[in-house]
Amino acid sequence: MIATKDIRIEKDFLGEKEVPSVAYYGVQTLRAVENFPITGYRIHPSLITAMAIVKKAAALANMDTGYLAKDIGHEIAEAAQEIVDGKFHDQFIVDPIQGGAGTSINMNTNEVIANRALERMGYEKGEYAKISPNTHVNMAQSTNDAFPTGIHIATLMMLEELLITMEELHAAFRAKAKEFDHVIKMGRTHLQDAVPIRLGQEFEAYSRVLERDIKRIKQSRQHLYEVNMGATAVGTGLNANPMYIEQVVKHLRTFSGFPLVGAEHLVDATQNTDAYTEVSAALKVCMMNMSKIANDLRIMASGPRVGLAEIQLPARQPGSSIMPGKVNPVMAEVINQVAFQVIGNDHTICLASEAGQLELNVMEPVLVFNLIQSISIMNNGFRVFREYCIKGITANEELLKQYVEKSVGIITAVNPHIGYEAASRIAREAIETGKSVRELCLEHGVLTEEELDIILDPFEMTHPEIAGASLLKNKKM
């Protein structure tokens, strides 16, 4: 290695390259930066951390087998731990979308750890004869097992955070369901008046579907716990000592905090990426459900003067550059857009997973880029949706009550008491005259005021049973 004050010269089998003297990355990282200026993004911090965990576990496992000198292995492990602790993340400069099945990410990791380990031992960066990114940091590994294992750990880390946020959002929906349990409103099917429902019942439904999504995402993690570490290049484990394979998984379990196990069949685990598509599918279903909820809230909050105006969403910002006083349902709208992105990401993940060939899927970089993005924007979206929207929703109770009283749909509750034909005539007259169902029932003498009070009671109309069933005990149709 040749070095000056500002640069050092590193070389690989393709030739020499100038590397900034202060940089912890090396020649292979710089080649990747030149080759793949694709997204303008950097590697996600969770993946950087996960890759460092992989390298620390590998170093200790290689020391366990006796193949890696303890002084070198110790410094590699310590350098990796520094990255886990959040240091040197600015040295991970390769684009997340890249050719090579993740080799650039793997080598960026190897080079940063090697150079930091060299520095810790008192050597200059780039003195790879002492500690090599390949010989030492990447010992008994291939990108094809180190990178997928890092993806598994990063995804599990991010899902853990997402699930906490989802539980908090679920609690917010449950709280609103309880708060609004007494609020009667008109239910709608086909966007037309149907029969009454309580606003709390609608929010309870939102909490229930989110509860299923939480369970679905938890279940989707099952195959992420299986890692192919020790598979090396094609799953056969060439250059990986059996003791190393056992020990590296043990160390991964300890450092990650997840119940990781070695994959039962390493060739299968190296070829196939269905573990990621399973997670992505669960995320997609969740966002389909959340987007539907966001749509509902936008409809119910439409107005404020000539829309439904059933609920009020918290005002977060002025809504127009030309219309003074306009406020838009921006927090619901952003959830819709998160859904569109996650659904699109899922399609990309499916295509990337399908594109595997023979012993390896080389499309894992774009796959993990989209998977991590989906989890990240869901976590961020749910957090602000709960804090800035759901928690502050209020109901326009008096207006909702008026809607119910004016609705023709409540004739459905009267139907069992006067018969379908009579109910149809009253419904038609209500539509034509604008009179309420209550008024017309009294005008035609089909029911008394007291009977209507029982039948049209909000709780009578929003529970499984004939509204006013007690009135039918001695009455034959």
Map each language-model feature to its residues.
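Conserved, well-structured ligand/cofactor-binding cores
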Residues: M1-M477
